[in-house]
């Protein structure tokens, strides 16, 4: 393990290979602030080598049977599960995540997602077959697209890698994946493990920065690009991909509204919302961090969430029994500090609001109340352990406030009134609506948003179909 993390290389054509670039980037453990490895900043030649490797592998991988792909992917899941403690340690060192939380909340769902897509490989179907033109039968083929260029973020490195490569290779595609420049280690580890079960070139991983990502998108070989990242990054990818008319899937930022009516079980709701807001240090595009409360319950919710932040949400080192670790990097910590430095005069910080005085990039669980709709903390994704609270008067205002942001990924409503809950679910302009819960996900259901949260879906059969193309075949019955 120590040897692996200190000598990072790209993974191309089934092998760990040194970059042709002499430029590297330090990898820092966010829990300590200390450098623990270096990763190459890959250049155009590295990208070209990876793309050509994937292109060659596609010639044969596309002809593998769904059953063969299912078998290979299930073996990958079994191998990851057998070595999961090693992976947890690697992920924690690179991200600062609490080890116990990573073991309990990430490994299990990630393995389930891999196995879901293994099974999905055998369930592609064309939804139409008939004689629409006399004497001729038409049917639909769903085919792999080819080489897929993929970019993953730093908030869930290993899980987001799975969301990309699992549906891609299950559908018969090959992959060139660039993980975030700050968190490449678990993805490289995974690719090396996967190679035992895949032909050379099916999975390729290159590390690097924003320019490396641009080279990935600009390359002539891939005709599909999938990114999970910031709105800025997604817009840049869409712009570059449009020059070659590449198909694009974007899973971008979020600013999830959490609408609480006064008939909700406030204590239970606030206990759950605190976990859903502070989990992963709030670095989740679906995090329950924008709370909107009916006026008659407002002060009770402010008090309950502030008490949760102060007393029940523990922050600490990966080895400790805590929910919250550090934010991912120094720039992110500085960004959070900036938001809190600019809290408007009409708002009040009722919990936290400052860095934790220890090495690393830790921020205290924070609650900011009395914010207005046009405040920057409401309109912009903070990606931090900061919950904001606003007040609404009636259903119509709650909907306006919930929808009044540029994002459209996830949302929740808390009420005992089923009719009201369903009205809100219909009115919310978000790709996911939870009712009396927030943040659970399952492999069978799609994840993806509207507006500046991007387009396309991860997970589910819909996410699997993103990695296919549709072909109409017509045959003359009398020939």
Map each language-model feature to its residues.
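Conserved C-terminal structural/oligomerization subdomain of aldehyde/semialdehyde dehydrogenase
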Residues: 32-38, 222, 259, 355, ...
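Rossmann-like NAD(P) dinucleotide-binding subdomain of oxidoreductase/dehydrogenase enzymes
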Residues: 126-268, 392
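Structural signal for hydrophobic packing residues in well-ordered secondary-structure cores
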Residues: 58, 62, 77-84, 88, ...
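Glycine-rich loop-to-alpha-helix module at the N-terminal edge of alpha/beta enzyme cores
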Residues: 34-124
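Residue-level signal for inorganic ion chemistry
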Residues: 33, 69, 91, 114, ...
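Short, well-ordered beta-strand elements within core beta-sheets of diverse protein domains
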Residues: 36-42, 57-63, 150, 258-261, ...
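ALDH superfamily catalytic-core signature
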Residues: 232-372, 435
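Hydrophobic face of amphipathic alpha-helices that form TPR/SEL1-like repeat modules
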Residues: 1-31
């Amino acid at each position: 393990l120590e040897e692996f993390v200190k000598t990072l290389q790209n993974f191309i054509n089934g092998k760990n290979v040194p970059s042709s670039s002499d430029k590297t980037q330090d990898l820092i453990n966010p829990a300590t602030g200390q450098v623990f490895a270096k990763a190459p900043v890959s250049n155009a030649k590295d990208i070209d080598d990876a793309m050509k490797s994937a292109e060659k592998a596609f010639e044969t991988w596309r002809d593998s049977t769904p059953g063969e792909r299912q078998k290979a992917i299930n073996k990958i899941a079994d191998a990851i599960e057998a070595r999961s403690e090693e992976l947890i340690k690697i992920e924690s060192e690179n991200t600062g995540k609490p080890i116990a939380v990573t073991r309990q909340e990430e490994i299990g769902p990630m393995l389930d997602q891999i196995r879901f897509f293994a099974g999905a490989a055998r369930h592609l179907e064309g939804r139409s077959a008939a004689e629409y033109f006399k004497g001729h039968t038409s049917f639909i083929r769903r085919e792999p697209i080819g080489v897929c260029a993929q970019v993953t973020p730093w908030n869930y490195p290993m899980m987001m890698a799975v969301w990309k490569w699992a549906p891609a290779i299950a559908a018969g595609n090959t992959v060139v994946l660039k993980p975030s420049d700050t968190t490449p280690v678990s993805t490289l580890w995974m690719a090396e493990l996967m190679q035992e079960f895949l032909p050379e070139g099916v999975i390729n991983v290159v590390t690097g920065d924003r320019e490396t990502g641009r080279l990935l998108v600009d390359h002539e070989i891939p005709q599909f690009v999938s990114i999970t990242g910031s709105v800025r990054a997604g817009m840049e990818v869409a712009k570059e991909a449009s020059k070659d008319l590449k198909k694009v899937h974007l899973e971008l930022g979020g600013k999830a509204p959490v609408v609480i009516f006064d008939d909700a079980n406030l204590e239970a709701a606030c206990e759950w919302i605190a976990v859903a807001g502070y989990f992963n240090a709030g670095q989740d595009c679906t995090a329950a961090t924008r709370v909107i409360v009916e006026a008659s319950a407002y002060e009770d919710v402010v008090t309950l969430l502030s008490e949760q932040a102060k007393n029940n949400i523990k922050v600490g080192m990966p080895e400790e029994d805590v929910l919250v670790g550090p934010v991912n990097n120094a720039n992110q910590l500085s960004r959070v500090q900036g938001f809190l430095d600019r809290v408007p005069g009409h708002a009040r910080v009722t919990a936290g609001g400052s860095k934790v005085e220890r090495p690393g990039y830790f921020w205290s669980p924070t609650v900011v109340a009395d914010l207005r709709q046009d405040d920057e903390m409401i309109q912009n994704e903070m990606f931090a352990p900061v919950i904001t609270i606003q007040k609404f008067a009636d259903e119509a205002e709650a909907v306006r406030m919930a929808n009044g942001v540029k994002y459209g990924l996830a949302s929740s409503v808390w009420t005992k009134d089923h009719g009201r809950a369903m009205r809100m679910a219909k009115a919310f302009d978000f790709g996911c609506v939870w009712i009396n819960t927030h943040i659970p996900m399952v492999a069978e259901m799609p994840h993806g948003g509207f507006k500046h949260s991007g387009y396309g879906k991860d997970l589910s059969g819909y996410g699997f179909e993103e990695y296919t193309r549709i072909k109409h075949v017509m045959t003359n019955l009398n020939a």
